[in-house]
Amino acid sequence: MRNSIKTIKYLVLLANIYAVASHAEIQLSGNITQGGMVVGTTTPDNVVMLNERKLKVSKEGSFVFGFPWNDSTEYTLTIIDANGNKEQSSFKPIPRQYKQSNIKGIAKKIMNPNPANVARSAQDRKQTVAARKVDSDYNYFAQGFEAPRQSKVTGVYGSQRLFNSVLKSTHYGVDYRGQVGAKVQAPASGIVTLWVPDMFYSGGTLIIDHGHGINSTFLHLSKSYVKVGDVVHKKDIIAEVGKSGRATGPHLDWRVNWFDVRLDPQLVLDLPPIKQ
């Protein structure tokens, strides 16, 4: 096990863990960078800790973790085998530079919502927060992701968004061009945990659970072909592009979370499926 962890430490220092450890104890794939996701496999009865947080390990030995967009935390990954032997490796996410974009034409009622809409958006948030807390045993996240649309990317993760020249938010998704009614496919298999057709800010909002806290959110949809509880498979047609909610035109906003940690979907797409 010691040689395996030494290999992991070497890979971590390179910041990108695309190669996997040559030993069978643990394999990792991912990006040690802000917004990155790391998927690993290990012996199923090993305990995996990220700092003080115990990570779920599936019966196949899969586990996953990720980093916020502005993360500067020092992390320690700890592997404890069935005999109590412990190995550790420390690392820190590599910082990134993000773009800034100015979005014009945002309606006054969106920029300065009235009390009723503030209350409505708070209720919307409760629903999305609850859906993103789901900690299922599925390991669909380890099977690789594909883009939900094969169209031009018009907005990227981490960009600082100015609405009518006023700095308002950070964009946590990736935007794809598409006309109203254009098809959206599931980027990975999972279970539908939320569908609301008319949230105040995000409009038609769909969330799919991929397991272990990894979930996809699709915003501004005009239609969903699936409902809560449905099982979907990678590349299934699940919805249609729209311009609902706070959108100045039709497009798909796709987001990926690890619980409440917002990940970069384009980095997630870089991860190959993990052999199990």
Language model features with spans:
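Sec-dependent signal peptide recognition
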Residues: 4-16
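Zn2+-dependent peptidoglycan hydrolase active-site motif and core
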Residues: 187-222, 250, 255
